[in-house]
Amino acid sequence: LKDGFKDSEPSIGYGLTETNAAGTLNLGKDYLKHPGSCGRAIPPVTDVAIIDENWNFLDESKVIGEIVIKSPANMVGYWKNEEATKEVFNDDGWFKSGDLGYIDDGFVYIVDRVKDMVIRGGENISCIEVETAIYDHPSVQEAAVFGIPEERLGESLCVAICLKPSMNLTQAELESFLQDKLASFKIPSIIQIGHEELPRVASGKFSKTQLRDV
């Protein structure tokens, strides 16, 4: 983008409806140096931190946890839903974003959604990471990775794939393709391959709830 538009200043930001879009900002030279980051917190409006599942703040750099935001722009709460409000706020006004990420030298990096992290045999697996590797295959048009309960390992990693028209791909071929791209425990154990478009919700995202029920 910068090469094509010499006078442009590429930028990206991060925020949620619940934070009135306030969160982080990455623009100009910072963006060119850290293109994978959604930026730094916007002072003095926002503070951003990382917590574990027990609301303990993680001070170590590059440690993955849930992104939390504190800001005067944060919502007061969900309309007539006190229980849902309590689930996402602590007593100090920090809001749980539902996004997994880490902070490196002040720059925030988003890894995945909390609900899209699959725990398989004690290992955390990012669905986005696996989907990205699968999309590298030239036959794949759509791919949705998700977990389903499994007694021995906790969750099984599954993927539903829609192939491009006239293209073919077997489970064995996909597994072989992924061996050089992913650790073995990140390769899905359940693979559904077809030519039908994957179901989506109103926002356009894949309906992983519906896929789990198939």
Question: Where are the regions that the model predicts?
Answer:
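Conserved ATP/PPi-binding loop(s) of AMP-dependent carboxylate-activating enzymes
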Residues: 24, 40-45, 56-88, 125
